[in-house]
Amino acid sequence: MLCHWSRRIALAIGFLSLGPVQAAPRPAPAAVQVSEVASGLSHPWALAFLPDGSALITERPGSLRLWRGGRLSPPIPGLPKVYAESQGGLLDVALSPGFAQDRLVYLAYAEAGDGKSGTAVGRGRLSEDGTTLADFTVIFRQVPKLSRGQHYGARLAFDRQGYLFVSLGENNDRPTAQDLDKLQGKIVRLRADGTVPGDNPFHGDKRVRPEIWSYGHRNPQGLAFNPWSGALWEHEHGPRGGDEVNIIQRGANYGWPLATHGINYSGLKIPEAKGTKLAGGAEPLYWWEKSPAVSGMAFYDAQAYPQWKHSLFIGALADQALIRLTLEGDKVAAEERLLKDRGARIRDVRVGPDGAVYVLTDAPQGALLRVTPGEAK
């Protein structure tokens, strides 16, 4: 990995005040304390903490489990049928902003149809004892269904007003990320019931899907709101190189596949790419020349460990690490890689109610790890 700063490039439009920054120099890894708090999970993909400190965990083959008191429940009944081939399956999980009153749990998953598959989102009501999910209803479907098993995106995030944002991969069909009549390679904004807000940027334009909030994305598997600015941050997989962190702006084009810092897995240029920048498009805040294969993202805004304040934690699948980006406002000041010694693919990252960082390892016998700062080496 190249470890020098690239020069800042001012955006051609006013979406962002910062230019893209290549991966920053990394200090020597700091020690962390790690404990395995759950094991035997089948390719766990996401977790969401409940108000009582327990957590819901999705397993990609199609199960939802409750972790409570150090133990995993049996699979919770009441889930939809998922398309669990290749990269598909049961993916993200999020709680309703009003969960304490309504008990609604949102799930993103791959759904088969028309001979292919696409991302779907639904919600159901979790029983008080956490043993069943009732009245599951699909509230959103990616159309058309184009995936043969790749690039679902499928992260969920609610903003402070209760709107639901969903990241959608381009189903490994590159040009569709620029097609505004399709929902591939997009981030969409919905009401909590799945209906479309009238103030979405393209609402009323019959040539454009009204759900679209931003476009030009490849496979966005990180989505979270910055707790200090309120802005929506996203990260996405590049092809061979070019993983990105972006600040998402209303109606913006993030370039894929017309602009990328990556190349094809074959080593050849992306056929549609015109360079690393797209005229009138938004550039990444931060990018990597060598892809860590980013998945899952969490801002650290807890009080328990001040040394981690204003950090952004990101999972890495290929690099088998927990990436910590130190932030100064909307700038990345430093990067370090944690958990490298474990040799585990990190699929999701969340901050727990106790202030610890929790990560899921992606494996046939995956685990939930609790991570806290240790003594400096």
Residue ranges and their predicted role:
Residues 166-184, 242-244, 248:
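Short, conserved, GDST-rich strand-edge loop motifs in beta-rich repeat architectures
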Residues 208-249:
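Repeat-solenoid scaffold signature
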Residues 35-36, 73-80, 132-141, 195-202, ...:
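Beta-propeller fold detector
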Residues 23-174, 222-225, 230-238, 290-328, ...:
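Acidic, Gly/Ser/Thr-rich repeat motifs that build Ca2+-stabilized beta-propeller blades
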Residues 23-33, 131-133, 195-205, 262-280, ...:
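Blade/loop signatures of beta-propeller domains
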Residues 8-19:
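Bacterial N-terminal signal peptides
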Residues 217, 332-353:
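Conserved blade-ending motifs and adjacent loop-strand segments that build the rim/top face
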Residues 120-129, 180-193, 248-249:
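Beta-propeller blade signature
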